[in-house]
Amino acid sequence: MIISMDQFGAKPEQGFDNTLAVMSALEYCREIEGAELVFPQGRYHFWPDKAAEKQLFISNHDQEGLRRIAFQLTDHNGITIDGQGSEFIFHGPMIPFVIDHCRNATIRNIVIDWENPMFAQGTVIRADDDSFDLQLPEGTNYKIENDGVWFNFGGKTEKVWGLNEFDPRTKAPAYQSGDRISWGNYRKVRIEESRPGVITYRGKNIQLPQIGNVIVMRFSRRENPAFFVNGGENVILDSINIHHAPGMGLLAQWCRNIRLHKFNVMRRPGSDRMVTATADATHFVFCRGQITIDQCLLENQLDDPCNVHGIYARITEKLGEDQLMVELAHGMSKGIKIAEPGDLIEFVRRDSLLPYANLRAKNVKVLNKDYIIVTFDQPLPDDVHIHDVIGNRSSNPDLTVTHSTVRANRARGFLITTAGSVLLEHNKISTPGAGIKISGDANYWFESGDVKQVMIRNNEFMDCNYCCPDWGRAVIDIDPEIENPEAYEQCYHRNISIENNRFVTFDVGIVSGHSVDGIRFVNNVIETSDSYPPHHVMKYPIELKACKNVTISDNQWPNDSKAIGLVNDSEIKIT
């Protein structure tokens, strides 16, 4: 059944708030299985003032309580929303789409943007000694107070906490810029207004940006994704352009089967904005079934284009022979469901990341956003330790990424930590950090877990890792956070195949890794470029340690006579 938004009073007019019209339309559609809600093509505006409000715990985002929502889809079955190419323009802090426990939902043919983004930018007009000047665009509303620069976003005044340098020629992070004027380094600088619209930054030993480069000024962090998919199954996001989001482009958690087709997080053509989303383009937590990413462009976001993982929960107390208290340790994982009754739960050592037992969850009792009591179907292992972690083996989706492009973002490319079957094929990857990162940790982000079957095939890697070592040591970086991987007989990751890819690189490092049982690097072509000066972080093109069953063969190196790798502390001739 096709339903037009005209029926509910939607208007593609500047200054008209369409939030209530959408709310009424979605309530109507909830009672109609298979409803198709259609927007006549236009430019529709949304404000948070009269939007629905809900407590949401969104993984890897700021956990700040109530959020305002424009499109709140809850328990819809078979709904389709077709924008027919319409632009949805948002104002201030709100989530455009929440898809909560819906089945067979499709969103297609829309453009998402914010009238005013959650960042500011300026141009470097002077840089010498221990200071530089930043020229803000004419008319920028800001203030300098308490040795800080402040901007307004959605009625709140936010303090800048970091700077990222972009090259206006490539529209990408500048060579070797990294996060070197952010976080702790930013707190060391002194700030003053040299004249209206020009800010001077001073500090000993700060990394000076290049004159003419663009500085992105970051305030707040990860307020709201453009799409939040929570639970449900069979969700399709098709032909969607996200030009800005004050958080991630998409955060999906506990969803079974999600498909992204022509889902683009991309700069608006003709815009001078350097940034799209202020965090990852796409992010999947505790998902199940199949994740498919096809023909997508993910660019210029302030974190990775794609991250797939679970969450390790830290053991804090043994309550009985079959019962544990666990904690969600990272601030951006608070309140996230970790398991359901019947799920297979893995017990993992914090220091080695190696599993030592598997039990089924019998009951999962959430005390609050921090602590959870898990009761198991059998007695706990005798050697369970406080500060070990548990992971959910039942939430390990398969991932397929094809015919997609990732580029010009801050940080890395694909972050993969799922034990499901993974295929990356026919993609173009150009990132300032590692193009692919396969990790796992139980110390900071607590992002689980090990991979079991990864195929990286027929991709092009173009000048990756030009901000090194900030976001990786090599084009492909396999670095589970194990302090001394050589101390353990067992490996954390398994079966990683890198085949028939083309690597164009200005530097040496192609693959760096440890704790992998079964790694293949076969039939790849490596070419040199002069895009950037080499940084020489790695001595050898392939450096592996604490690895087993390594195959390196039939590759084309720029200079075969010098193709030497380092495997388990031994130099070997690689072909």
Predicted segment positions?
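Ser/Thr/Gly-rich low-complexity blocks that favor extended beta-strand/coil architectures
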Residues: F90, W114-N116, P137-I191, K334-K369
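Low-complexity, polar/charged sequence tracts that form flexible coils or short amphipathic helices
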Residues: I89-H91, V98-D100, F219-S220, F228-E233, ...
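Small/polar beta-strand repeat architecture
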Residues: P173-R222, A357-N358, K365-L399, R407-A408
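Short glycine/acidic-rich loop motifs that flank beta-strands on beta-rich extracellular proteins
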Residues: G34, F90-P96, N116-A120, E223-A226, ...
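Solenoid scaffold repeats with emphasis on beta-solenoid/beta-helix
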Residues: I3, A35-L37, F71, I79, ...
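Conserved GTPase G-domain signal focused on the G5
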Residues: D6-V22, Y28, D294, S439, ...
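N-terminal extracellular ligand-recognition/capping segment immediately after the signal peptide
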Residues: Q7-G9, T19-L26, I32-I79, Q84-V98, ...
